[in-house]
Amino acid sequence: MKIIFDHINGFGKISNQDLIYADVFGYPEINDDLDELLENGWLPWNNYWFQSRSVRYDLSKIQFHKKTKKNAKKIEYQLGKPSNEDVDRIAKAYQNKKGFISKHVFDNDLMLENSIQYFYESKLIGFVCYKLFKKSFIGIQFAWDYEKPQLSLGNISFFIESTLAKRSGCIYYYVMGGYEECCLYKSEIDGFEWWTGKEWSKDKELYQNLCKRDSLIEIKNVNCDI
């Protein structure tokens, strides 16, 4: 993998404190094992990879409630990119419910190309963008309209995706980064592991404390234009 440090869009402070910030990107080379990159904490994004406090689950240890399996029978799914209209409709409802602002995935056609669409009574109610490798499944972004919250589509989606991943021979299910209190729930799922920067940890308490700390940090907008 070729590693790039972006010092143009990065910034630093050296007069009264030592601070250097630069985005770090990785570009896989022809012979790189993509599952090995995931194993070492890298996550894919468009044509580059990045390091993150990523979260994954050992598929051999995941257990699902009977209620989730029962509700899953009410949902039909199909592979393929949802229409722009459906993406906008579902993403808006999902963001309003969660209080999220960022739309970087929902506006990314490349990410949406590989999606699983979820239908209830013939209506598209949710979708997940994903990537599939030889031994790894990555759930990049999930969204649903919350019109029937009793369905708990998030649990059903995770059940279906885990089942498909196992059938494809995957060992791990990756769910991108674990930051802020909105990601606390990720530590409550069987088979949970998170990337510390040097190893995969099963320490739930430390992970939860870090997520809570994230939510206390305030970041002011930094204008890096020259």
Language-model region placement:
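Terminal substrate-recognition subdomain of acyl/acetyltransferases
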Residues: 1-76, 175-226
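Conserved GNAT acetyl-CoA-binding A-motif
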Residues: 165-177
